[in-house]
Design a protein with these regions (language model features):
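Adenosine-phosphate binding glycine-rich loop
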Residues: 1, 6, 137, 143-227
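Short, ordered loop/turn segments at secondary-structure junctions
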Residues: 46-48, 66-67, 108-109, 136-140, ...
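Catalytic or ion-coupling anion/metal-binding cores of large enzyme and transporter domains
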Residues: 64, 95, 100-107, 205-206
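ADP-ribose/adenylate-binding Rossmann-like module
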Residues: 102-160
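Residue-level signature of catalytic and energy-coupling elements of molecular machines
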Residues: 34, 104, 181
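Glycine-rich phosphate/diphosphate-binding loop of Rossmann-like nucleotide-binding domains
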Residues: 2-96
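Short, solvent-exposed amphipathic alpha-helical segments in soluble enzyme
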Residues: 35-37, 57-60, 118-125, 148-151, ...
Length: 227
């Protein structure tokens, strides 16, 4: 299927409809790419404050009406939502998913399995030839049919659960990773004292173990829960 609107002597072909779930770094990049290719793009996120970012890229923001900041967690990251919110979200997405040619899912919750946003019934409502690209597959996926590192066909609908996508672009992935590691070290390391500044919130927020003790609360909870 073509992505952009095409007007030809033989008739008009409407643009592809792309739905992006999760408007973090990956989601915003997917929105920008789809718009650049000429698609009609909609996006949704549990954090209402990203609406401006989504709309600045030319996409329509699908907002779940809620009286609270239900999906906003510590540091502005997404968190687990209430059952009532999930019900409203499912009602909002049901028809949008059915109408989409491509669905890109990127929704993740720090320290938790990826939330299921696309039910089995939603997948079955999509047209044959439609594609779901589940970028959350490594954490379980946002689609019920997702199988990590596999591509499955559900009645003609392709569900792509490829993991480590960055590894397919290894040269640039390595460049970006090394640049970020260097920036982190240069920011947090005190050259004169030859030690990391533990009072820096970036350093302290990235630390798992110090002086032989687990200092990260999520890591501590996960270990205690497995015992």
């Amino acid at each position: 299927k073509y992505m952009p609107l095409l007007m030809t002597a033989a008739g008009t072909i409407p643009p592809a409809k792309v739905l992006v779930l999760g408007a973090g770094v990956a989601g915003l990049s997917a929105i920008a790419t789809a718009k650049r290719l000429g698609a009609q793009v909609e996006a949704s996120d549990v954090r209402p404050e990203v609406k401006e970012q989504v709309e600045s890229l030319g996409a329509k923001f699908l907002e779940v009406k809620s009286d609270s900041d239900d999906g906003v967690g510590e540091g502005g990251y997404a968190k687990e939502t209430s059952d009532e919110y999930k019900k409203k979200q499912a009602e909002l997405l049901e028809q949008r998913v059915a109408d989409s040619d491509i669905v890109v899912t990127t929704a993740l919750i720090p320290g938790r399995p990826a939330p299921i946003l696309i039910s089995d019934d939603m997948v079955k409502s999509m047209r044959p030839g439609s594609v779901i690209m589940d970028l959350a597959a490594e954490n379980g996926g946002n689609c019920g049919f997702t199988k990590p590192d596999e591509i499955v066909d559900i009645n003609g609908v392709i569900v792509d659960g490829t993991i480590n996508i960055a590894g397919t672009m290894s040269v640039h992935a390595s460049q970006l990773y090394s640049k970020n590691v260097s920036a982190f070290i240069l920011h947090g390391y005190d050259k004169e004292k030859k030690e990391f500044n533990l009072e820096d919130e970036i350093v302290s927020g990235s630390m798992f173990i110090h002086a032989g003790e687990i200092v990260d609360e999520r890591t501590k909870s996960a270990i205690e829960g497995s015992n």
